[in-house]
């Protein structure tokens, strides 16, 4: 049995249905053309960029000087994603800048092995204070670079302890005449809230702990560090500081005890230099 024939549309309905089909086809055609046009444009831009990158790649000449200017603090792994790092850099948030330790060491090792690189210049102005263990790894890589026969030159307008540990490995160290080099030792500063919490706000804090060397909750029950906390902090800080002084003394061929004595008399040394921190650094 044949199905019943479909009812025929009236001419007006047929006109609008046909018009709709034409509009729908035109819309899809335009969208497809736009999509493929954008796709082709992106491909062209990528090809041009790759071509320019390949053509603009500089070929190292003999006796090349490589400038290494780390910006930020040394980390084992980035703490944020690439988008967040790009946004932070775009808004000028320099405190958020990080350098992966392995990237910096690889750059130093590549310079060591490249026969066309004659010297390396370290610009340390934007290197932020970093972990001592990481700084020692970089210092060891710089020592290997010098041992390979490459000249190492360090420059900075101002140097703190992190920057100077790396600069000390260089053949030559340059400091801005208006700059400074301060080695002040290690310290730890914590805030204590007992007076504010108990005396002013009336907050009672009940601390339960096992053992004397448990200082995590001390800020809530004391106004200053306990003798046990000071002893524990001094134990590890003295060890780190002695290692730091030893590294500096070996790199600069100095006596570690004499170096420590100069740091212990820092105010007197600055006064003897007339307040000129750069001249004091030369002493």
Located regions from the model:
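Active-site-proximal helix/loop microenvironment
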Residues: 266-283
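Small-residue-centered hinge/linker elements
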Residues: 2-270
């Amino acid at each position: 049995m044949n199905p019943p024939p479909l009812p025929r549309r009236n001419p007006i309905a047929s006109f609008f249905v046909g018009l709709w089909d034409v509009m729908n086809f035109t819309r899809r055609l335009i969208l497809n053309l736009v999509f493929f046009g954008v796709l082709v444009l992106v491909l062209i831009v990528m090809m041009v960029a790759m071509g320019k990158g390949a053509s603009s790649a500089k070929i190292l000449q003999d006796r090349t000087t490589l400038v290494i200017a780390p910006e930020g603090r040394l980390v084992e792994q980035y703490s944020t994603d690439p988008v967040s790092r790009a946004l932070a850099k775009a808004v000028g948030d320099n405190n958020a800048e990080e350098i992966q330790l392995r990237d910096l060491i690889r750059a130093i090792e590549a310079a060591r092995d490249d026969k066309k690189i004659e010297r390396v210049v370290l610009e340390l102005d934007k290197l932020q204070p970093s972990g001592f263990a990481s700084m020692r790894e970089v210092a060891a890589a710089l020592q290997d670079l010098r041992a390979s026969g490459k000249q190492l030159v360090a420059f900075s307008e101002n140097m703190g302890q992190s920057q100077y540990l790396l600069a000390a490995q260089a053949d030559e160290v340059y400091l801005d005449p208006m700059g400074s080099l301060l080695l002040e030792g290690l310290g730890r500063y914590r805030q204590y809230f007992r007076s504010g919490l108990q005396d002013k706000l009336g907050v009672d804090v009940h601390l339960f702990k096992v053992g004397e060397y448990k200082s995590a909750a001390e800020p809530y029950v004391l106004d200053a560090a306990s003798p046990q906390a000071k002893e524990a902090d001094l134990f590890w800080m003295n060890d780190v500081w002695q290692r730091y002084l030893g590294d500096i003394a070996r790199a600069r061929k100095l006596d570690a005890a004499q170096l420590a004595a100069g740091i212990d008399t820092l105010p007197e040394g600055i006064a003897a230099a007339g307040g000129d921190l750069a001249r004091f650094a030369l002493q």
